[in-house]
């Protein structure tokens, strides 16, 4: 009885279908894109059959066969349901259509049966003319199939007629009077584009690459292959990497087996040669568990090697795609930028009619989420990071409970590589289908309880599986880490204290739609600044002890080294302790001295942790709200140190995580099941041609930064709760928006080098060009300037920024880069010229203040709906930055002064902007003002300079 009660907690009740059966049934009966399904536009036959994305490809390939079969003939095929019914239901329901006819030419359902026994005119003559026009347009834009060196036999395809005898007779009479096809067209061979076509091996590689590009079924998987090929630096580098990985795995397993089973360690002390301690035929004397494990790992290695061989063909296809269609060779792929690859993909999309527009209007509904028209930089990033964007949002919104379920470690978060694998297995593979799309079942609240219960069981099952797999993984990782880093630590013992970001920190720092290589570049540039920040804090007690240990160990090592130099033959064999010679103690004291010396900072290091952390934040873009005003505190340092730990500690946590991961999967994550199901339902949006995406990853370029409604002021509490729930924390979305525009901005190929960030290593002390903390404003001012109630926060202001010229630069000057459209974004993704205006809620303490009042503008024409405050003067109740932005919003023309702040990424007030000078025309001033004009300009400059302070100059 007790056993049945326990099992009933994990098994579904009797008589109710499993959640997986419900998901499979829903996936089988629902279209991949449910926009048409929800709108009631899905085409169905009498049996309720749905269409798949493959049907569009069949429709396109059969258009070539229209040289033999007219659209009228396809219509006549649909007029014979009785003939199809005679063959039996087994053939009609078979998934393999031997007739070669696509389902879009299916038999008409009873609701659409136009056949009537009293009709005097053949059904083919009742077809409207627009079908011919539609298919003719399709055929005109379709590329020719790849040519072959041989021609198949010409065959005449019989044209099916109506089902009744009278209609068949009338049909023959109509054909005699008006033939539908010419004889030469009837004798033309019907070439069908298919992956199984044998003549593809003999075609030209370029035409074959173009054909494969035109027949891509899953655009997400194809773009992932393109990106993986880019990261792998070509086919030969990828193959070499995989071969070396296989050899590394084989060496670790083989060498570990040799060390544990083939050496008799009891004979080591008295033996002189290796043969004295070797065990003969050691593999036959291995234990049963060791033999089973060795065979299991051997089979795994063989499977990986076989998979590597199978991938050669796919890599060759990708090599041809890069070389022939994108014009990128294996030597150039190591130096070309991803932005250039995206640009060439967009050019290929526009140049290839089969992918750009060779789809008729009646077939576009089949495209679903595989539209190649939606393939600019934003769409490609969303496709590549469809799952990663959800995980970034889960980490940002703290949906996952990653704390250890241990009483004395409940405040410790654990997120290792092993736990990440389990999360992808339990959550992502559960929510996404085989095509990489979110299952529409998760978007309906009617199945919330069943889906949540299924997710909870997946967590528990994964925890059980980790118990059996963990011992093998622990042994492998320990041996691999030992073989890899022991020699490095032996040569340079100070590397033991080297640090790197934890896996949890990487997911916290990563932004939406930020590809891995761009994120890795940004994070790698932050390492020098992060190490400098950690070393900034005073460690007086540790420094004193480390200095003493370094002095003692260095003195002992120096004496032993000097004695060995005087008489090396005698002294190197001298035993200081039993069986411990001078050489042994030289290694010990030298290692201790190196470690202790590494803990002592340089004497010339200037202590300024606040400035050092600002430099780190400029790269990581991570600044929690509770850090405001506390960057100098030790609490912030400890919190940052948890994200930036020593490599040896990260490795130990990875090993321990294999023990603690089952407990997290059993006790913590099942409690988050309801929140996880709600998260995917509430933060998923559908984009036409793309499918379902994370709502945070769909940037509204037209609205820019003003994407959050300020709400009703009469209910501030309710507005804040709802806005906080549907927004990201710590300004993640705005930082992602800015970062994306900087990575894929206008002319990213280097025509404007001033917009590219130059990397400089951290100085030993703040440079003379950096203002002191007092002149830069307080930390609270900086946080208030960049953070708002709704989470619209950008990175901290500092002297340097990975976004090119700092938007919040210490001088307070605006970014005068041109708002030219990006060539990597389609027109509907181009940033709006009014997308960067400040929100209605400004900072409580503006960071940059001008000591003089802005004169009213006189040279601009304001819109009729603008208030007098926006067009002239200043209102003390409104922020100065918003007033400045509004004063230039109604200008006309295309000059800098008329564009105003709409395209600028600087949220601070521009003290030296041209608009503050009364809106004068620069061309009029520079072009022949005369002596009097120059005198007036000089007087104006002297008048303005008197009121300025040293801030911002």
Swiss-Prot record:
Listed Basic and acidic residues bias regions: 22-39, 62-76, 104-114, 165-182
Post-translational modifications: Phosphorylated by atg1. Atg1 phosphorylation is required for preautophagosome elongation.
Cytoplasmic side: 1-242, 313-458, 480-544, 602-647, 669-953
Non-traversing membrane segments, not crossing the membrane: 459-479, 648-668
Pfam families attached to this UniProt entry: ATG9
The keyword Transmembrane helix appears for this protein: yes
Molecular function via GO: phospholipid scramblase activity
Region ranges (Disordered): 1-188, 789-902
Summary of the function given for this chain in its UniProt record: Phospholipid scramblase involved in autophagy and cytoplasm to vacuole transport (Cvt) vesicle formation. Cycles between the preautophagosomal structure/phagophore assembly site (PAS) and the cytoplasmic vesicle pool and supplies membrane for the growing autophagosome. Lipid scramblase activity plays a key role in preautophagosomal structure/phagophore assembly by distributing the phospholipids that arrive through atg2 from the cytoplasmic to the luminal leaflet of the bilayer, thereby driving autophagosomal membrane expansion. Required for mitophagy.
Family to which this protein belongs: Belongs to the ATG9 family.
Assembly and oligomerization: Homotrimer; forms a homotrimer with a central pore that forms a path between the two membrane leaflets.
Protein name: Autophagy-related protein 9
Lineage, uppermost ranks: Eukaryota, Fungi, Dikarya, Ascomycota, Pezizomycotina
């Amino acid at each position: 009885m007790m056993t049945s009660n326990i099992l009933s907690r994990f098994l579904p009740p009797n008589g109710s279908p499993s959640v997986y059966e419900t998901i499979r049934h829903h996936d089988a009966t629902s279209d991949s894109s449910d926009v048409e399904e929800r709108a009631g536009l899905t085409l169905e036959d009498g049996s309720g059959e749905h269409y798949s994305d493959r049907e569009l490809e069949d429709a396109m390939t059969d258009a070539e066969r229209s040289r033999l079969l007219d659209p009228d003939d396809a219509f006549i095929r649909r007029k014979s349901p009785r003939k199809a019914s005679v063959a039996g239901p087994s053939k009609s329901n078979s998934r393999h259509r031997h007739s070669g006819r696509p389902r879009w030419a299916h038999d008409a359902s009873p609701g659409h049966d136009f056949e009537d026994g009293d009709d005097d005119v053949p059904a083919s003559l009742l077809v409207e003319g627009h079908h011919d026009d539609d298919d003719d347009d399709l055929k005109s834009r379709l590329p020719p199939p790849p040519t072959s060196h041989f021609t198949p036999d010409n065959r005449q395809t019989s044209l099916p007629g109506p089902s009744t005898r009278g209609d068949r007779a009338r049909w023959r009479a109509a054909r005699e009077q008006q033939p539908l096809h010419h004889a030469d067209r009837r004798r033309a061979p019907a070439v069908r584009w298919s992956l199984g076509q044998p003549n593809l091996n003999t075609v030209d590689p370029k035409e074959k690459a173009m054909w494969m590009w035109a027949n891509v079924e899953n655009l997400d998987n194809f773009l992932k292959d393109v990106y993986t090929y880019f990261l792998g630096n070509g086919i030969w580098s990828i193959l070499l990497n995989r071969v070396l990985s296989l050899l590394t795995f084989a060496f670790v397993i083989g060498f570990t087996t040799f060390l544990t089973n083939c050496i008799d360690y009891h004979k080591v002390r008295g033996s002189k040669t290796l043969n004295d301690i070797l065990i003969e035929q050691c593999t036959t004397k291995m234990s049963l568990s060791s033999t089973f494990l060795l065979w299991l790992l051997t089979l795994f290695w063989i499977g990986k090697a076989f998979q590597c061989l199978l991938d050669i063909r796919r890599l060759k296809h990708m090599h041809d795609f890069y070389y022939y269609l994108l014009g990128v060779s294996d030597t150039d792929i190591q130096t070309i930028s991803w932005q250039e690859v995206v640009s060439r993909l967009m050019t290929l999309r526009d140049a290839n009619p089969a992918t750009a527009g060779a789809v008729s209007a009646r077939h576009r509904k089949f495209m679903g989420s595989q539209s190649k028209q939606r393939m600019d930089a934003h769409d490609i990033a969303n496709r590549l990071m469809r799952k990663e964007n959800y995980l970034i949002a889960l980490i940002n919104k703290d949906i996952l409970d990653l704390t250890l379920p241990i009483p004395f470690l409940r405040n410790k978060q654990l997120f290792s590589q092993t736990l990440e694998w389990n999360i992808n297995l339990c959550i992502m593979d559960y929510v996404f289908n085989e095509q990489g799309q979110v299952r529409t079942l998760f978007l309906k609240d009617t199945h919330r309880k069943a889906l949540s219960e299924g997710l909870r069981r997946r967590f528990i099952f994964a925890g059980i599986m980790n118990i059996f797999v963990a011992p093998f993984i622990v042994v492998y990782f320990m041996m691999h880490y030992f073989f890899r880093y022991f020699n490095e630590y032996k040569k340079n013992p100070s590397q033991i204290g080297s640090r790197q970001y934890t896996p949890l920190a990487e997911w916290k720092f990563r932004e939406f739609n930020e590809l891995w290589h761009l994120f890795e570049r940004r994070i790698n540039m932050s390492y020098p600044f992060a190490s400098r920040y950690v070393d900034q804090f005073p460690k007086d007690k540790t420094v004193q002890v480390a200095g003493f240990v370094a002095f003692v160990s260095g003195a002992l090592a120096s004496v032993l080294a000097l004695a060995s130099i005087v008489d090396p033959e005698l002294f190197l064999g001298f035993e200081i302790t039993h069986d411990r010679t001078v050489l042994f103690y030289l290694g010990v004291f030298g290692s201790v001295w190196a470690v202790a010396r590494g803990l002592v900072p340089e004497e010339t290091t200037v202590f300024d942790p606040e400035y050092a952390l600002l430099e780190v934040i400029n790269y990581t873009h991570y600044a929690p709200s509770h850090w405001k005003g506390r960057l100098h505190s030790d609490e912030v340092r400890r919190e940052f140190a948890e994200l930036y730990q020593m490599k040896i500690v990260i490795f130990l946590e990875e090993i321990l995580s294999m023990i603690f991961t089952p407990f997290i999967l059993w006790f913590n994550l099942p409690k988050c099941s309801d929140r996880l199901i709600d998260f995917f339902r509430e933060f998923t949006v559908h984009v036409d041609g793309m499918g379902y995406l994370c709502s945070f990853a769909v940037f509204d370029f037209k609205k820019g930064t003003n994407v959050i409604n300020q709400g009703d002021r009469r209910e501030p509490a309710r507005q804040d709760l709802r806005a906080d729930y549907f927004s990201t924390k710590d300004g993640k979305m705005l930082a992602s928006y800015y970062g994306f525009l900087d990575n894929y901005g206008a002319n990213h190929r280097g025509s404007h080098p001033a917009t590219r960030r130059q990397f400089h290593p951290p100085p030993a002390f703040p440079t003379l060009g950096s203002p002191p903390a007092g002149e830069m404003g307080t930390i609270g001012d900086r946080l208030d300037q960049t953070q708002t109630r709704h989470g619209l926060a950008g990175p901290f202001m500092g002297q340097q920024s990975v976004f090119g010229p700092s938007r919040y630069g210490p001088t307070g000057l605006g970014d005068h880069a041109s708002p030219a459209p990006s060539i990597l974004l389609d027109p509907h993704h181009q940033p709006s010229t009014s997308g960067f205006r400040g929100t209605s809620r400004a900072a409580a303490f503006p960071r940059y203040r001008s000591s003089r009042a802005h004169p009213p503008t006189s040279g601009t024409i304001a819109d009729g709906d603008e208030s007098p405050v926006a067009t002239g003067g200043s209102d003390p109740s409104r922020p100065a930055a918003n007033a400045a932005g509004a004063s230039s919003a109604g200008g006309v023309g295309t000059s800098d002064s008329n564009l105003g702040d709409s395209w600028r990424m600087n949220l601070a007030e521009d003290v030296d902007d041209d608009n503050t000078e009364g809106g004068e025309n620069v061309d009029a001033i520079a072009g022949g003002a005369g002596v009097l004009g120059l005198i007036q300009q000089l007087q104006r400059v002297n008048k303005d300079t008197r009121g300025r302070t040293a801030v911002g100059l």
